[in-house]
Structure formats: structure tokens, C-alpha cells
Amino acid sequence: MRESSQIRETTETKIKLSLQLDEGKNVSVQTGVGFFDHMLTLFARHGRFGLQVEAEGDVFVDAHHTVEDVGIVLGNCLKEALQNKEGINRYGSAYVPMDESLGFVAIDISGRSYIVFQGELTNPKLGDFDTELTEEFFRAVAHTANITLHARILYGSNTHHKIEALFKAFGRALREAVERNAHITGVNSTKGML
């Protein structure tokens, strides 16, 4: 089974995270940031991933360190769980509607970290979650997992719905990208490596 568990401890956060790419039944998320817990749970459920997250952070300051560090550990776990990347689709994309909002995510498990994030988040805060942390989370995942990630909010008026559409699209796009494909021998690259 493709899986990884990691712990990251700094003076600002303590993150314990486990990711299972092939087993999506066990999802448990506790970061101390309610809206972020909800988004990570949606990502895992819609991607059919197992995900267990326990995070303690300096949320008395704000949620920035917690959200970013969870993204770093998730990216590291993804990179480790993918092993040599043989036989996977490599690419994945998904459009996800959430009522009036439409989100899109495209992923290339390329070995090159890059992110494009487009979207207007008009409400600056949802509960204790600063909405600008949405981009910070995706940036941290893309950087540490060495993937190319494009995330775009095409339209919408409700900030909660916009972010929810992105996290669901992220799960669905990543599921497609990591899926094993019987028609692919080795890695899906003319270079012979990713």
C-alpha cells in the first residue's frame, strides 16, 4: 500500500500526519482550525484518501503556521507515498461546482514544484481561518511534494463555496494523477524518470 506517516515539530507547530493513497476509509482531522479541518476532510473524502492529521500550533497568534506546516507535511507524505511514481497517470484535473461557485484544479506529478493560484476571495476570514491561507496551503503542498499545481476559482460569490470547490477539486484531481494505470509501463515520461 502506498502510504506515509511523518511528524514535524518546530517552535511554532507540532504536526503528525498520515496519508494512505489506496485506502480512503479512515479520515480524522484535528488542527485546531475548524474551517481548515472541514476542508482537509473534504479533500480526503473526494480524493478517496486515508488521512489522519493531529496538529498543535500557535493559533493564539493566527492560523498561518498551522495551515502552512500541515501543507508542508502533506506534501512530504505525498512525495514519499508515491515512491518511484511508476505506473501512475501523472496528470489529473477536475472541475467542481459548489452551488454558485466553480473551482478547477490541474496537477502534474512532474518532480518540479510550481503553483498558479487564481481567484478572488472577498471575505477575508471564515471562522478562525484567514482565507488568504488557502493559497499558502496549496503552495506548501506543491513545493514539498514537487508537483505542479494550478488552482483556479472560475466564479462564485460565496467565499466558503469557492474554497470548498477548490479543496474538492484538489482531491479529485490528485486521485486521478496518483491512480495506477495498467497501460503505463514505468514512469509516464519520455525522460524515463520524474
Curated annotation (Swiss-Prot):
Pathway: Amino-acid biosynthesis; L-histidine biosynthesis; L-histidine from 5-phospho-alpha-D-ribose 1-diphosphate: step 6/9. This is Imidazoleglycerol-phosphate dehydratase. Coiled coil: none annotated. The keyword Cytoplasm applies. It comes from the Bacteria. Its EC number is 4.2.1.19. One of its GO terms (cellular component) is cytoplasm. One of its GO terms (molecular function) is imidazoleglycerol-phosphate dehydratase activity. It catalyses: D-erythro-1-(imidazol-4-yl)glycerol 3-phosphate = 3-(imidazol-4-yl)-2-oxopropyl phosphate + H2O. Belongs to the imidazoleglycerol-phosphate dehydratase family. Keywords: Amino-acid biosynthesis, Cytoplasm, Histidine biosynthesis, Lyase. One of its GO terms (biological process) is L-histidine biosynthetic process.
